UniProtKB/Swiss-Prot annotation:
It comes from the Bacteria. Residues 74-122 are annotated as: Domain II. Its main location: cytoplasm. It comes from Nitrosomonas europaea (strain ATCC 19718 / CIP 103999 / KCTC 2705 / NBRC 14298). Residues 123-339 are annotated as: Domain III, AAA+ region. The keyword DNA-binding applies. Keywords: ATP-binding, Cytoplasm, DNA replication, DNA-binding, Lipid-binding, Nucleotide-binding. Domain I is involved in oligomerization and binding regulators, domain II is flexibile and of varying length in different bacteria, domain III forms the AAA+ region, while domain IV binds dsDNA. Oligomerizes as a right-handed, spiral filament on DNA at oriC. This is Chromosomal replication initiator protein DnaA. Belongs to the DnaA family. Residues 1-74 are annotated as: Domain I, interacts with DnaA modulators.
Length: 459
């Protein structure tokens, strides 16, 4: 094995240790090492598309250079190249898609029950665009993947699976892809459908014995967006029909986008053959927004609604409303309604008055002691273990979860949280919080536990 090949294996080993599973599989794993006899001392990596290439340049080149210094005690030549599908192949895919639209559209328009809304056959909300989507650490990977899919539907990542809690922007991001594609190609056959509506379409086709028409419609789409796929759980005939539609679209290089409230393998009552297919493309999570992102969301929403909202007031609202974007926007609407009712302009004092009941409920329910007891009960350990010096894994991980939740749900400083956990240093709390954030993207069990505990504590 040449020294460059050995070095790249060295890099892969370290990246696996440094990155969570999702990050490694998305950015590093797709890179291909190219060995050139004339450039034996040059690391040449081939990126599958421009998106990955740019991301590597922006985020990993410096780290690769550092690894080279460690491995060789000197810098090496390093080059990133793009190896996209041949233009003729891409053109063939586009021509085939256009031909399928022309061939199948007349028949699809006759389909009963699934194309009745002629004014908006795609069922897309035009306000859900990438420009209107506020980006932060919690959703930047999901947004980046969505843009790549929008620019190269059926070629980039297929399917795209987006998961996360309620009200975090999954539907917005999914429909932004559809609106982007529709803007570039007004003739594209796109359908956004909530999983419950898809179930209803299956039932209707069964009642009217019209499965041929049902299949003709769903199998002829260029872009299928299925929201909240967890509602397919236990519905065997629906899963069977979706399985056939999924296969037909993927084989025809048509794009499938799916959302769920949890990781694919965590969806109970879903056939294994569907779960495995959901993993064929890119699976990305959307997490609850961090403070800065929540402030940005409020300010952007206020601007769109022509509401005068200063940063101090936005910061106050964002500081206390942490769960999801929907509740954040709900709090803003409450402040706006209170402003109109009282005849006073929106200010920090008015926001405090408008939200006092909501804040009182939150403050009453969530204390550090409550968090410790809830987490201890959940993991079946003693509350005393939360502030003990024990280092066994069965206690360390729940303790880290409790610290992370305390940072999210209380107004205590890091030193105060550390003090409540047996006089630990603030850096221990910070490490615990970062560790749990990292594990939530790579360990479905930890993510499930964290979400369940947050739900319990918020009531």
């Amino acid at each position: 094995m040449q020294k460059i090949e050995t070095f790249w294996h060295f890099c892969l080993k370290h990246f696996r240790q440094e990155l969570n599973g999702q990050q490694f599989n998305t950015w590093i794993k797709p890179l291909k090492l190219e060995v050139c006899p004339d450039e034996k001392n040059t690391l040449i990596l081939i990126a599958p598309n421009r998106f990955v290439l740019q991301w590597i340049k922006d985020n990993f080149v410096t780290r690769i250079d550092e690894m080279a210094q460690d491995h060789f005690n000197e810098r090496i030549s390093f080059r990133l190249e793009l190896r996209e599908p041949a233009e003729s192949e891409a053109q063939t895919v586009r021509t085939s898609a256009q031909k399928n639209r022309e061939d199948k559209k007349p028949a699809a328009e006759k389909t009963q029950g699934v194309t009745s809304r002629k004014t908006n056959p795609s069922q897309l909300n035009a306000s859900f665009t990438f420009d209107a989507f506020v980006t932060g650490k919690a959703n930047q990977l999901a947004r980046a993947g969505a843009i790549q899919v929008a620019e190269r539907p059926g070629i980039a990542y297929n399917p795209l699976f987006i998961y996360g809690g309620v009200g975090l922007g999954k539907t917005h991001l999914m429909q932004a892809i559809g609106n982007y594609v529709l803007e570039l190609d007004a003739g594209a056959k796109i359908r956004y459908v909530h999983a419950e509506k898809y179930v209803s379409d299956v039932v209707s086709a069964y009642q009217h014995k019209s499965f041929d028409k049902f299949k003709l419609y769903y199998h002829s789409l260029d872009l299928l967006l299925v929201d909240d796929v967890q509602f397919f759980s236990g519905k065997n005939r629906t899963q069977e029909e979706f399985f056939y539609a999924f296969n037909a679209l993927i084989e025809a290089h048509k794009q499938v986008i799916i959302t769920s409230d949890c990781y694919p393998k965590e969806i109970s009552g879903l056939e294994e053959r569907l779960v495995s297919r959901f993993g064929w493309g890119l699976t990305v999570a959307i997490e609850p927004p961090e403070l800065e992102m929540r402030v940005a969301i409020l300010l952007k929403k206020a601007l769109a609604e022509k509401i005068e909202l200063d940063e101090n007031t936005a910061f106050f609202i964002a500081k206390y409303i942490r769960s999801n974007v929907r509740e954040l926007e709900g709090a803003l609407k409450r402040v706006l309604a209170f402003s109109r009712f009282t005849g006073h302009s929106i200010s920090l004092d008015l926001a405090k008055e408008a939200l006092k009941d909501l804040l009182a409920i939150q403050n009453r329910q969530i204390s550090i002691e409550n968090i410790q007891k809830t987490v201890a009960d959940y993991y079946k350990i003693k509350v005393a273990d939360m502030y003990s010096k024990k280092r066994v894994r069965t206690i360390v991980r729940p303790r880290q979860v409790a610290m992370a939740i305390a940072k999210e749900l209380t107004q205590l400083s890091l030193p105060d949280i550390g003090e409540a956990f047996g006089g630990r240093d603030h850096t221990t709390v910070l490490h615990a919080h970062r560790k749990i954030i990292e594990l939530r993207t790579s360990d479905p069990g930890i993510n499930r536990d964290f979400n369940a505990l947050m739900h319990i504590l918020r009531g």
